Amino acid sequence: MGQKVNPNGFRYGVTKKHNTLWYADKKDFADILLQDDKIYRFFNKFTREYLIGKVEIRRNQNGHLSVLVHSAKPGAILGQNGENINKLTQDIQKLLRNKELKLNIEVVNIKNPDLNAIILAEQIAIKLENRAPFRVAQKFAIRNAMKSGAKGIKTQVSGRLNGVDMARSEGYSEGEMKLHTLRQDVDFAMATARTTYGAIGVKVWVSKGEFLDGNGEKNVTTEKN
């Protein structure tokens, strides 16, 4: 079953923390959930520009909204003298139609972007759009991830590869990838490359080892006897 479901959703509440954390009354739940969806879609547009690897949303009982943006280019999000992040704040307030919204955007630096599945998937998609061979694009990402300390990585591209008439899927993997083991820390992401031959789907799985029993933060390497 672990091979068929989204590895992130499979682990939320077990070994992965939810990206959204808040409580709301029943009458307000739908509106707040819709706001979260708009915020996620807003930052998805900047994934490539700012190398955004994760977005977290936190709300307190006073209605204060905090958005944590994990990025490999925090300086680009902040802008000179914080001008860009102020603009992003105003854009979100306008999107949610609430200029009085207490909103705080925090930028978290991603120390190792080569272990982030979202960034790796977007890098492969960019190379495909620049007409790089799909094998080279995947192996480049695999090599960088393994050098950065990944325990395993798996990639897959699907579509009209190299412009052939019949669409197909092709992927590569290296290291361990236990999708059926919930204590295995697996990061998963998808991206789309818009090429002259049509859309090509990209999937990336990154394994960072196994969680210790009762600890959701520290990882250990799995060794085979």
UniProtKB/Swiss-Prot annotation:
GO terms for biological process: translation. Residues 39-109 form the KH type-2 domain. One of its GO terms (molecular function) is mRNA binding. Pfam families: KH_2, Ribosomal_S3_C. SUPFAM superfamilies: Prokaryotic type KH domain (KH-domain type II), Ribosomal protein S3 C-terminal domain. One of its GO terms (cellular component) is cytosolic small ribosomal subunit. Keywords: Ribonucleoprotein, Ribosomal protein, RNA-binding, rRNA-binding. Binds the lower part of the 30S subunit head. Binds mRNA in the 70S ribosome, positioning it for translation. Part of the 30S ribosomal subunit. Forms a tight complex with proteins S10 and S14. Belongs to the universal ribosomal protein uS3 family. This is Small ribosomal subunit protein uS3. The lineage of its organism: Bacteria, Bacillati, Mycoplasmatota, Mycoplasmoidales, Metamycoplasmataceae.
